[in-house]
Amino acid sequence: MKQTVTMIIEQDPESGWYGCDLDGTLAEYHGFEGLDKIGAPVGVDSPDSALNTVKKWIAEGRDVRILSARISHDPKGDGKAAIEAWTEQYLGRALPVTEKKDAKMITLLDDRAVQVEENTGRIVGGAKALQAAGDAHRQGEKGR
């Protein structure tokens, strides 16, 4: 007889983690130039920027991690080391780096993500939001 096990994970801010993309979200990005080439921080003077939000989360003692595709093909760990050094320099400490999200991730700040309403699949902002995201990505690719 087969048994089914259902696991419910509650989003407890004390036990989960907060993710933030690097390229184009925390750091300037105009196309890939190498694992160890990371742009200058963006949004330094904007209180509601991703950079300052991450700094606030760190000050509040939250578990903050960098979620970056940059390290998905990084066998020697050069990209990960560069990201850790960048976060130490601009955020005050080396943050953990991953290329994967998991069930404990509470939220993600990312320049390429488009918000989808939970359990409906509806794109928040509709087709306009999707079009704007595509346009922004194409514009960034032209800057290379």
Q: Where in this protein do the model-derived segments appear?
A:
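Catalytic phosphate/metal-binding cores of nucleic-acid and nucleotide-processing enzymes, i.e., regions
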Residues: M1-G143
